[in-house]
């Protein structure tokens, strides 16, 4: 669905990355007005923004005064994204200053506001910035955690602008909700698994599956947005790292099991969105397995992998929530109910698999069944929306939730 987006651009070296973010928005069919600060235009000129957006650049409260741009842009937007958000912009937004078109737009916006900070580590960690971020978040503004990496010059640390694809994914999540997520997971610790495991057969081959990790990453982002401390365990996922998570990368089912069981010990909720391989080769060939001269295929003996979800179900504390997944063919709901009982889980998310379904897509059609007998059948929708709905169900079941 096409939305009206204001893309604010702050005056930092990361301003050039906003060009890629703008491209992602426009290629998805969104209408984007770019509102750069005067300093941002010193990094990327107005003709670039106009060419990429197909819209005139809005950078001056004194241009087209009869259209009242300092009010109109914010009031008409479905989402305001500022990337990069400099230390100066954070301070102005927190204190309600309005000395240019972008800060005026932030004050008049009645839609969700998403800020992507980029600055040196010392500036991000300064008590004034910490207080400004806390103020903005308390008012419902979504402030993304900066990434860790190379900064301007030779410095490295926290303060790097998140990957444009990651900012875009978070924006999709906000648009799917229509608002900023409630902080109903604040103080909670959750574990999310994502992707698909691979079981090596020889140095070049493996047994695996087609899981992209998109649904699991959507769960992780949604949990961060709702205030949770998130441990994301990713198995062979080729997606930008979600902002604000503790990321653990694994390859095999054994590695996934070890990381998940350890992380789940003190978690309030565990979402097993990863697709572990059910089987692995009984032996690993140190050299590449060759074709035989007679054309006979080799026999590969398989052994069963540990059932991570079932182990988590046996280990889980009474107050802990476990969400498992089932990618099914045939009678999906009946198979899902049986799996829910076997795993001793609280919720199961069931989706039917087949050509052009689920794997790698941006949308999902699922049925969520609870151990209490509840059934929620969700229509096809963005995976971000699926994640938010499931988190709603989890929050409602967590002890102490109102």
What are these regions (language model features)?
Residues 1-402:
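A cross-family phosphate/adenosyl-ligand binding-site feature
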């Amino acid at each position: 669905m096409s939305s009206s987006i204001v893309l604010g651009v702050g005056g930092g070296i990361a301003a050039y990355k906003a060009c890629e973010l703008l491209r992602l928005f426009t290629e998805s069919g969104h209408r984007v007005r770019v509102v750069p600060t005067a300093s941002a235009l010193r990094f990327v000129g107005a003709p670039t923004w106009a060419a990429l957006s197909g819209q005139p650049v809005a950078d001056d409260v004194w241009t087209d005064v009869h259209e009242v741009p300092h009010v109109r842009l914010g009031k008409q937007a479905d989402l305001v994204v500022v990337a990069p958000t400099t230390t100066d912009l954070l301070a102005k937004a927190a204190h309600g200053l309005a000395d240019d078109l972008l800060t005026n737009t932030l004050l008049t916006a009645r839609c969700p506001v998403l800020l992507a900070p980029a600055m040196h580590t010392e500036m991000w960690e300064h008590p004034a910035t910490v207080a400004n971020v806390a103020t903005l978040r308390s008012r419902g503004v979504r402030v993304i955690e900066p990434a860790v990496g190379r900064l301007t010059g030779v410095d490295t640390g926290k303060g790097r602008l998140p990957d444009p694809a990651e900012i875009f994914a978070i924006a999709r999540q906000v648009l799917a909700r229509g608002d900023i997520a409630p902080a109903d997971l604040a103080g909670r610790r959750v574990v999310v698994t994502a992707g698909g495991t691979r079981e090596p057969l020889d140095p070049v081959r493996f047994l695996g599956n087609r899981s992209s990790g998109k649904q699991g990453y959507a769960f992780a982002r949604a949990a961060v947005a709702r205030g949770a401390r998130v441990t994301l365990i990713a198995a062979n996922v080729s997606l930008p790292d979600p902002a604000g998570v503790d990321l653990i990368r694994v390859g095999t089912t054994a590695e996934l099991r070890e990381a998940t069981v350890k992380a789940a010990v003190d978690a309030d909720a565990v979402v097993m969105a990863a697709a572990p391989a059910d089987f692995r080769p009984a032996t690993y060939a140190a050299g590449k397995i060759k074709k035989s001269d007679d054309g006979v295929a080799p026999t590969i003996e398989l052994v069963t992998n540990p059932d991570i979800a079932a182990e988590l179900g046996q280990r889980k504390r009474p107050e802990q929530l476990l969400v498992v997944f089932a990618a099914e063919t045939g009678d999906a709901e009946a198979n899902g109910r049986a799996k829910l009982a076997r795993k001793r889980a609280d919720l199961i998310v069931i989706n039917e698999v087949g050509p052009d379904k689920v794997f790698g897509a941006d949308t999902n059609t699922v049925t969520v069944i609870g151990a209490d007998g509840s059934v929620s059948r969700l229509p096809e929708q963005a995976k971000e929306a699926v994640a938010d709905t499931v988190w709603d169900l989890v929050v409602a079941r967590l002890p102490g939730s109102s």
